Amino acid sequence: RVRRILVVRNDNIGDVLCTTPALRALRRAFPEAHLAILVAEHCRAAVLRNPDLTEVLTYTKAKHRPRGLGLAALWDLTHAIRRLRAQRFDLAIAMRRPFSRSNAWLAYAAGAPFRLGYLPPASHPFRFFLNLGREVGAVASHEVDGCLGLLASIGIPPAGRALHLDPDPEAQAAIRRRLREAGLPPPAPGPGPAGEVAGGSGLALVHISNRRETSRWPLASFAQAADALHERLGLAILLSWSPGDSQNPLFPGDDGKAEEVARGMRARPIFLRTPELRELIAAVSLCNFVLSTDGGIMHIAAALDIPQVVLFGKTGPEHWAPVTEKGQILRSGGRADRISVDEVVAASVEVMSRWGRGKMFAAARGTTGRRTAARGEG
């Protein structure tokens, strides 16, 4: 009988959020089980308040530690493995596709007698890390469906595809204070988007960062689009980015780029520096709209049910599109920088006229209720 289950997901924020439907399916299949997840420390806030989990375990990857602290990283990982083995898990699930040696090794090192995952070729030297699973085949389906499909291989049915994310109330309160200090009347407390602020406006979070070159949008384009969101839709602009210096080898930041975008805007944006993931999650939860490129932020918005427009580069939407009906995906030849500002503004107006706050957005669009399907994958 399976009483203790470990899910291993040691990659990034969006990947972790795409695992949350599988966590729901596991909880429904094993309502009394101890269900734990092991994630990288920087992803902790993505699952810390997840109601399907009994426990969240973390470790810090070596690449996210300062140089010269290799021994500290090894000690941290060794300590994490000791904690895992002490828990005596019955089932460990390596929740990555295709096969990841580091992910499968963590499942193996946990000492569980049953280790489920997507299997590598039969000749792979580390195939023994897993003793249950399925062949990955072509990685064509969505990541959410890949996670659910792995569970289906051992008879666990899905329990929906929606992502789950609970914001930290203390972090939300802190963001409200920061908005007030920035001169923006705070949104009303409570669940869901912030709603109206002074003058009937709402909040748009514009996230400019992306590590992939093909997924970056020109800074001048971000500035023009942000001005259009403010002028046409009456949205106050929260400028969001990966904080820090661009030369930081651990977590490269875009402080300089954020300043450049702000200088290029006619409107005055609110700088929203979020060193901690829980702060970024809280900020998104208080917004009415998100504009971003294809990264973790789009999955945060989807999990929080916030309308969005996402600019995709080379990344395949069939695998990584945000799981939501409230959005549009824009693509152009595998490069985000080929998408025009006019396309982004038109998509934003369309999304907000359909899923925004009613008549204000319909009026901005020049229509009174026409509906068209979003191009995002739900």
Task: List where the protein language model places each region.
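Catalytic machinery of carbohydrate-active enzymes
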Residues: R1-G378
